[in-house]
Amino acid sequence: MHDQLTIIVPRRGINDEGKGKKHALYCLISAAKTEYVWMQDDDIILQSLEVKGESLEVKGTDLLILPLRMQSENEKPSLLELLQIAEYAAIQQLTIETAKRGHAVMCSGANLIARRDRWLESYPDLHPEIPSGDDMFLLESFKRRGLKIDVCESEQLTAVVRPHTSWRAFWQQRMRWAGKAPKYTDKDILLCGAIVLLANVLQLLCPLVLLVKFPLEYTLIKKRDASVSLSSALLLGLIYPIYMLIALVGGLFRRQW
Protein backbone atom coordinates (compact mmCIF):
# COMPACT_ATOMS: atom_id res chain seq x y z
CA MET A 1 0.00 0.00 0.00
CA HIS A 2 2.90 2.40 0.58
CA ASP A 3 3.40 2.87 -3.17
CA GLN A 4 -0.20 4.14 -3.37
CA LEU A 5 0.04 6.54 -0.42
CA THR A 6 1.88 9.74 0.37
CA ILE A 7 1.94 10.77 4.02
CA ILE A 8 1.08 14.46 4.33
CA VAL A 9 2.12 16.28 7.52
CA PRO A 10 1.52 20.05 7.30
CA ARG A 11 3.69 22.10 9.65
CA ARG A 12 2.85 25.68 10.55
CA GLY A 13 5.56 28.10 9.49
CA ILE A 14 7.46 25.44 7.52
CA ASN A 15 5.40 24.51 4.47
CA ASP A 16 2.44 26.87 4.67
CA GLU A 17 4.19 29.87 3.03
CA GLY A 18 2.66 32.01 5.76
CA LYS A 19 -0.86 31.26 4.47
CA GLY A 20 -2.04 28.69 7.01
CA LYS A 21 -2.63 24.96 7.24
CA LYS A 22 -5.04 24.68 4.31
CA HIS A 23 -2.53 26.23 1.93
CA ALA A 24 0.17 23.92 3.29
CA LEU A 25 -2.08 20.93 2.62
CA TYR A 26 -2.80 22.17 -0.89
CA CYS A 27 0.90 22.55 -1.70
CA LEU A 28 1.84 19.15 -0.26
CA ILE A 29 -1.05 17.27 -1.84
CA SER A 30 -0.53 18.97 -5.21
CA ALA A 31 3.08 17.78 -5.17
CA ALA A 32 2.18 14.18 -4.27
CA LYS A 33 2.36 11.57 -7.05
CA THR A 34 0.30 8.80 -5.43
CA GLU A 35 -3.39 8.03 -5.83
CA TYR A 36 -4.07 8.54 -2.13
CA VAL A 37 -2.75 10.90 0.54
CA TRP A 38 -2.62 10.10 4.25
CA MET A 39 -3.03 13.30 6.24
CA GLN A 40 -1.57 13.37 9.74
CA ASP A 41 -1.04 16.08 12.33
CA ASP A 42 2.60 16.50 13.26
CA ASP A 43 1.93 15.79 16.95
CA ILE A 44 0.05 12.49 16.69
CA ILE A 45 1.56 9.20 17.85
CA LEU A 46 0.96 6.18 15.62
CA GLN A 47 0.52 2.83 17.32
CA SER A 48 2.73 1.11 14.76
CA LEU A 49 5.18 2.45 12.21
CA GLU A 50 4.69 -0.66 10.08
CA VAL A 51 1.29 -0.81 8.40
CA LYS A 52 0.42 -4.06 6.66
CA GLY A 53 -1.40 -3.86 3.35
CA GLU A 54 -4.34 -5.91 4.56
CA SER A 55 -4.85 -3.43 7.43
CA LEU A 56 -5.25 -0.52 5.05
CA GLU A 57 -7.65 -1.27 2.23
CA VAL A 58 -8.55 2.00 0.55
CA LYS A 59 -9.31 0.99 -3.04
CA GLY A 60 -12.69 2.26 -4.15
CA THR A 61 -12.93 4.69 -1.22
CA ASP A 62 -12.64 8.43 -1.68
CA LEU A 63 -12.32 9.31 2.01
CA LEU A 64 -11.25 6.93 4.77
CA ILE A 65 -11.73 8.10 8.35
CA LEU A 66 -9.06 6.57 10.59
CA PRO A 67 -9.39 6.07 14.36
CA LEU A 68 -7.98 8.31 17.08
CA ARG A 69 -7.63 7.98 20.82
CA MET A 70 -6.71 10.61 23.39
CA GLN A 71 -4.19 9.70 26.09
CA SER A 72 -2.39 11.77 28.68
CA GLU A 73 1.38 11.69 29.02
CA ASN A 74 0.94 11.75 32.80
CA GLU A 75 0.52 8.66 34.93
CA LYS A 76 -2.16 10.54 36.87
CA PRO A 77 -4.01 12.81 34.43
CA SER A 78 -5.37 16.13 35.65
CA LEU A 79 -9.10 16.80 35.89
CA LEU A 80 -8.93 18.80 32.66
CA GLU A 81 -7.22 15.91 30.88
CA LEU A 82 -9.72 13.35 32.22
CA LEU A 83 -12.66 15.40 30.99
CA GLN A 84 -11.10 15.82 27.54
CA ILE A 85 -10.34 12.09 27.28
CA ALA A 86 -13.96 11.22 28.09
CA GLU A 87 -15.34 13.79 25.65
CA TYR A 88 -12.95 12.72 22.89
CA ALA A 89 -13.94 9.07 23.28
CA ALA A 90 -17.61 9.97 22.82
CA ILE A 91 -16.84 12.13 19.79
CA GLN A 92 -14.73 9.42 18.17
CA GLN A 93 -17.33 6.72 18.68
CA LEU A 94 -20.05 8.99 17.29
CA THR A 95 -17.77 9.62 14.30
CA ILE A 96 -17.41 5.87 13.72
CA GLU A 97 -21.07 4.97 14.23
CA THR A 98 -22.46 7.67 11.93
CA ALA A 99 -19.89 6.98 9.20
CA LYS A 100 -20.66 3.25 9.27
CA ARG A 101 -24.32 4.07 8.67
CA GLY A 102 -23.61 6.34 5.73
CA HIS A 103 -24.35 9.58 7.60
CA ALA A 104 -20.91 10.77 8.70
CA VAL A 105 -21.06 13.89 10.86
CA MET A 106 -17.41 14.25 11.84
CA CYS A 107 -13.86 13.43 10.85
CA SER A 108 -10.42 14.61 11.91
CA GLY A 109 -7.55 15.68 9.69
CA ALA A 110 -5.20 14.34 12.36
CA ASN A 111 -5.58 10.85 10.82
CA LEU A 112 -7.37 10.79 7.48
CA ILE A 113 -6.88 9.28 4.01
CA ALA A 114 -8.31 10.80 0.83
CA ARG A 115 -7.99 10.29 -2.89
CA ARG A 116 -5.58 12.96 -4.04
CA ASP A 117 -7.59 14.13 -7.04
CA ARG A 118 -10.85 14.25 -5.08
CA TRP A 119 -9.21 16.34 -2.35
CA LEU A 120 -7.83 18.83 -4.87
CA GLU A 121 -11.24 19.12 -6.54
CA SER A 122 -12.78 19.93 -3.15
CA TYR A 123 -10.18 22.50 -2.14
CA PRO A 124 -12.38 25.53 -3.04
CA ASP A 125 -15.03 24.14 -0.65
CA LEU A 126 -12.64 24.18 2.32
CA HIS A 127 -13.17 27.89 2.98
CA PRO A 128 -9.49 28.87 2.59
CA GLU A 129 -10.32 32.21 4.24
CA ILE A 130 -10.96 30.36 7.54
CA PRO A 131 -7.72 29.18 9.22
CA SER A 132 -9.10 25.84 10.50
CA GLY A 133 -11.79 23.29 9.69
CA ASP A 134 -10.23 21.72 6.61
CA ASP A 135 -11.37 18.26 7.72
CA MET A 136 -15.03 19.04 8.40
CA PHE A 137 -15.44 21.18 5.29
CA LEU A 138 -13.79 18.38 3.29
CA LEU A 139 -16.30 15.91 4.71
CA GLU A 140 -19.18 18.18 3.72
CA SER A 141 -17.78 18.60 0.21
CA PHE A 142 -17.32 14.86 -0.30
CA LYS A 143 -20.84 14.12 0.93
CA ARG A 144 -22.35 16.82 -1.27
CA ARG A 145 -20.56 15.37 -4.30
CA GLY A 146 -21.77 11.84 -3.53
CA LEU A 147 -18.27 10.43 -3.02
CA LYS A 148 -17.63 7.23 -1.09
CA ILE A 149 -16.78 7.74 2.58
CA ASP A 150 -15.71 4.85 4.79
CA VAL A 151 -14.35 4.38 8.29
CA CYS A 152 -11.62 2.12 9.66
CA GLU A 153 -11.59 0.76 13.23
CA SER A 154 -8.22 -1.01 13.12
CA GLU A 155 -6.26 -0.71 16.35
CA GLN A 156 -3.07 -0.82 14.30
CA LEU A 157 -4.09 2.37 12.51
CA THR A 158 -5.25 4.19 15.63
CA ALA A 159 -3.31 7.38 16.31
CA VAL A 160 -2.91 8.87 19.77
CA VAL A 161 -3.46 12.57 20.42
CA ARG A 162 -2.64 14.45 23.60
CA PRO A 163 -5.12 16.51 25.64
CA HIS A 164 -4.53 20.17 26.35
CA THR A 165 -2.82 20.80 29.66
CA SER A 166 -4.02 24.38 30.11
CA TRP A 167 -7.57 25.68 30.36
CA ARG A 168 -6.69 28.58 28.08
CA ALA A 169 -5.62 26.32 25.21
CA PHE A 170 -8.65 24.11 25.80
CA TRP A 171 -11.13 26.99 25.56
CA GLN A 172 -9.41 28.49 22.54
CA GLN A 173 -9.74 25.20 20.64
CA ARG A 174 -13.38 24.68 21.62
CA MET A 175 -14.28 28.21 20.58
CA ARG A 176 -12.57 27.69 17.22
CA TRP A 177 -14.66 24.57 16.72
CA ALA A 178 -17.88 26.35 17.70
CA GLY A 179 -17.05 29.40 15.61
CA LYS A 180 -17.20 27.36 12.40
CA ALA A 181 -20.72 26.10 13.08
CA PRO A 182 -22.52 28.77 10.98
CA LYS A 183 -20.55 27.64 7.91
CA TYR A 184 -21.82 24.06 8.02
CA THR A 185 -24.52 23.14 5.51
CA ASP A 186 -24.67 19.32 5.60
CA LYS A 187 -28.04 18.13 6.88
CA ASP A 188 -26.59 15.26 8.95
CA ILE A 189 -24.11 17.58 10.69
CA LEU A 190 -26.80 20.20 11.31
CA LEU A 191 -29.27 17.61 12.63
CA CYS A 192 -26.68 16.08 14.95
CA GLY A 193 -25.69 19.52 16.23
CA ALA A 194 -29.32 20.48 16.80
CA ILE A 195 -30.01 17.29 18.76
CA VAL A 196 -26.94 17.78 20.96
CA LEU A 197 -27.82 21.44 21.56
CA LEU A 198 -31.46 20.65 22.36
CA ALA A 199 -30.55 17.82 24.74
CA ASN A 200 -28.15 20.03 26.66
CA VAL A 201 -30.55 22.98 26.85
CA LEU A 202 -33.20 20.60 28.18
CA GLN A 203 -30.73 19.33 30.77
CA LEU A 204 -30.10 22.90 31.92
CA LEU A 205 -33.83 23.45 32.28
CA CYS A 206 -34.46 20.05 33.87
CA PRO A 207 -31.39 18.27 35.32
CA LEU A 208 -33.31 14.98 35.38
CA VAL A 209 -32.77 14.81 31.60
CA LEU A 210 -29.28 13.59 32.49
CA LEU A 211 -30.85 10.28 33.54
CA VAL A 212 -31.86 9.75 29.91
CA LYS A 213 -28.75 11.24 28.28
CA PHE A 214 -26.02 9.74 30.39
CA PRO A 215 -26.52 6.03 29.60
CA LEU A 216 -26.18 6.76 25.88
CA GLU A 217 -23.17 9.03 26.40
CA TYR A 218 -21.47 6.52 28.68
CA THR A 219 -22.06 3.70 26.20
CA LEU A 220 -20.35 5.70 23.45
CA ILE A 221 -17.44 6.59 25.73
CA LYS A 222 -16.80 3.05 27.00
CA LYS A 223 -17.13 1.52 23.55
CA ARG A 224 -14.28 3.70 22.31
CA ASP A 225 -12.11 3.92 25.45
CA ALA A 226 -12.66 1.38 28.22
CA SER A 227 -10.16 3.20 30.46
CA VAL A 228 -12.52 6.14 31.08
CA SER A 229 -13.95 5.91 34.59
CA LEU A 230 -17.61 6.28 35.50
CA SER A 231 -16.80 9.31 37.67
CA SER A 232 -15.02 11.15 34.82
CA ALA A 233 -17.86 10.44 32.39
CA LEU A 234 -20.50 11.47 34.93
CA LEU A 235 -18.72 14.73 35.77
CA LEU A 236 -18.49 15.51 32.06
CA GLY A 237 -22.19 14.79 31.67
CA LEU A 238 -23.05 17.12 34.55
CA ILE A 239 -21.04 20.12 33.37
CA TYR A 240 -21.31 19.59 29.60
CA PRO A 241 -24.41 21.76 29.02
CA ILE A 242 -22.76 24.81 30.60
CA TYR A 243 -19.40 24.12 28.96
CA MET A 244 -20.99 23.62 25.53
CA LEU A 245 -23.04 26.81 25.67
CA ILE A 246 -20.05 28.88 26.83
CA ALA A 247 -17.94 27.49 23.96
CA LEU A 248 -20.75 28.03 21.45
CA VAL A 249 -21.47 31.62 22.45
CA GLY A 250 -17.77 32.43 22.79
CA GLY A 251 -16.98 30.88 19.42
CA LEU A 252 -19.75 32.69 17.59
CA PHE A 253 -18.64 36.06 18.93
CA ARG A 254 -14.92 35.63 18.45
CA ARG A 255 -13.58 37.88 15.71
CA GLN A 256 -10.80 35.50 14.78
CA TRP A 257 -10.97 31.72 14.50
Model-assigned labels for residue ranges:
Residues 1-11:
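Hydrophobic targeting segments
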Residues 37:
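Short aromatic/hydrophobic "clamp" motif used to bind/position activated sugar donors
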Residues 33-34, 106-122:
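Conserved nucleotide-sugar donor-binding
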Residues 192-256:
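Membrane-embedded multi-pass helical conduit in multi-pass membrane proteins
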Residues 95-113, 156-159, 182-189:
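A recurrent flexible, glycine/aromatic-enriched loop bordering the glycosyltransferase active site
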